[in-house]
Amino acid sequence: DVERSRGLGDVYKRQLQERLQPVGRQYDLPMVSILDAVTPQFSGKEQKRVITKNQFFYDMFHPTNLGHTIMADCLEYLMEVCDTSDHARVDSFRQGMTEEEVLEQCLRGEPAIGNSFEKVKLLDRRDGYEGASMREGGFDATDHELQCVEMDQDLCTTPEFPYNWMYDGTKPDRAFFELTITCRALFLIFKDSGEVDAGTADVLVDGEFRFTADPHVNNWLHCNAVLVFQEKETAAHTVRIQMSGENLDKKFTILGFGYVE
């Protein structure tokens, strides 16, 4: 329930509780609010605090071991409450339906926060799409310095988006990547970085400037998905990603694209 924020000052500014709670309520899912559990006492007097914001959050893994312990304790308490409570919903008695039938009815209803990207698919060097063609330009290298995550029960980390396109700063005469794709929504996934040799890239759709992708906004090794366009109908578009004017000798990595047909 807590999104891992980028710094101590915004521990809960990017917290997703407000946006995701409606989903839990609609489908009657058990929820634990770390926000409600720990933040009220952050602003209390020192002698009344159980834990400070620094103690809960601030280390490279954010939250700290202590913070993770509190989160685990909250989830464990939730399981204890579930084990000792009556599992039958009030709705199931009132409507004469089983819990499974109630849930199935909920799933047939309108989504709580939309489903525009329910069927998004990955496009990268390995996973192609017949409705897409591309010119790599100077983005012909592969980046191996990637964000890594633990997958399933594997204790070793796995690099994310290994089938990428990287501009390595050595081809200023073709410092662009061009994608022609037929879809109704498109995400660009690019690599955030804190390295000084990382540069920015301008994103254009059908010749019109949309935004500049800047790896230094987040400033750490991270996968960043940004919406390039979203339309009601499927149509063909040409997306051009080109290094910004003074960044021709810098690096930029396109990790992949997400598209909705």
Regions found by a protein language model. Give the residues of each.
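Single conserved hydrophobic/aromatic residue that forms the stacking wall/gate
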Residues: 1-12
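Extracellular serine-dependent O-acyl
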Residues: 14-54, 69-83
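Conserved catalytic region of serine esterases and O-acyltransferases that act on ester linkages
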Residues: 55, 60-65, 69-261
